[in-house]
Regions:
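Acidic, glycine/proline-rich Ca2+-coordinating loop motifs
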Residues: 1-388
Length: 388
């Protein structure tokens, strides 16, 4: 996801509820009970974008769980974008990563997507770049070995996201990688190597600024389908390179501002069960042509046994699509109170309050805070059907 620091103002969301108490953490917005939250107002200001980012944990604060960075000791020597960055938006994306036990030894391995070189790099410069995607094999002793070249997943480009899934039901995890202007599907041969089957599968003909990827069997036919997030319709214009454009209340470099460009559509690839896919995003109603999408997650949010879809969008409203069980979806974002308008980046789904239904956690752009949406379906005995 985007990782540069511009001057976006801190933005907050306030949700007021009639019969519940709202507990506001320093960087979280919690959706609770009964009454629809107040709308989000872009442009709410704080002192500046980073003035509170380096706050230390208060002395004596209990730390039940602590993490230590062991990347170097573990052999994860990855460095994102080993090149000189310009003010072009595709160069400003962070590294996507995905865990998956591709060799079936019971230990998860790690794939990291990378921007190998600047957009202006020549083919020779790109080939000579030390950057590029990486696959780290888990050695089962706390360390990893870089097996990128030997495995055949050493593509060099401007890559953003990745996701593992067994798309052909052969018992081995395959890998999809999203890039600027490219979608790659790697088939797992079962011997530690992968084959690029993007053309054979029908994925290589789609050009766009592709970011997040999420696998899910939305039609429950036993074959996992693929959702791809599109960011913006980016086009470099040298005449605008030195200019600025508005982002919320701020003026930022034009070519670095996602608000300068119209949203890219999202793609839904239906798995045909024979190693190929058919793109049905518009037909299914999930192409989200108004969202600058960075992440998506499949989950059965309403408990009907069918996977629904949540999409996290940057500088555009997030979307929640309800599965209608007929290959189509209904946009219930507003009725479900989850269509917030911020710089949504990371997305995770889980039952944080252990009440039996999945909740949504979203990370946002610098100093915009995080959001935790609590699913009301089983909250205090209330069954909330957002479709009604």
């Amino acid at each position: 996801m985007p990782n540069h620091v511009s001057r976006r103002r801190q933005l907050t969301v306030r949700y007021t509820l009639a019969s519940a108490l709202l507990l506001a953490a320093a960087s979280a917005a919690v959706l609770a009970l009964r009454r629809k939250p107040k709308p989000y107002v872009p442009g709410q200001e704080n002192k500046d974008i980073t003035h509170e980012l380096d706050r230390a944990v208060p002395a004596g604060y209990p730390a039940a769980v602590q993490f230590t960075n062991v990347a170097e000791q573990a052999g994860i020597n990855f460095r994102h974008f080993q090149g000189k960055r310009s003010t072009q938006l595709p160069e400003d994306m962070g590294s996507g990563a995905a865990w998956g036990d591709y060799d079936g030894d019971g230990y998860p391995d790690l794939f990291i997507a990378d921007i190998a070189a600047p957009m202006t790099a020549s083919p020779a410069e790109l080939a000579a770049s030390p950057g590029g995607n990486r696959l780290y094999h888990n050695n089962r002793n706390g360390t990893f070995t870089d097996v990128t070249a030997a495995s055949g997943v050493d593509y060099k480009g401007l890559c953003n996201g990745a996701a593992w899934a067994d798309y052909d039901n052969d018992g081995k995890l395959d890998l999809v990688v999203t890039c600027y202007d490219h979608i790659i599907l790697y088939h797992n041969r079962g011997d530690g190597t992968f084959e690029d089957v993007s053309h054979k599968a029908g994925l290589d003909g789609f050009r766009g600024f592709w970011t997040g990827a999420s696998w899910g069997d939305y039609d429950r036919d036993g074959n996992v389908d693929l959702y791809i997030c599109g960011y913006v319709k980016y086009k470099y214009d040298a005449t605008l390179a030195g200019k600025t454009s508005r982002q919320f209340t701020e003026m930022v470099p034009y070519m670095l501002n996602p608000s300068s460009f119209p949203p890219e559509r999202n793609l839904l690839f239906h798995n045909n069960g024979n190693g190929t896919f058919t793109e049905v995003g518009k037909k299914a109603g999930v192409d989200d042509t108004t969202g600058r999408s960075l992440n998506a997650a499949w989950c059965d949010f309403d408990g009907d046994g069918w996977p629904d879809l949540y999409v996290a969008n940057d500088i555009s409203e997030n979307k929640l699509y309800l599965n209608l069980h007929n290959g189509r979806f209904k946009d219930i974002s507003e009725k479900a109170w989850v269509n917030e308008y911020r710089g949504s980046m990371g997305l995770a789904v889980g039952d944080w309050d252990r009440d039996g239904d999945p909740d949504i956690f979203i990370t946002h752009w610098v100093a915009q805070g995080y959001a935790l949406f609590s699913n009301l379906r089983y909250n205090r005995g209330i069954t909330a059907d957002p479709a009604n």
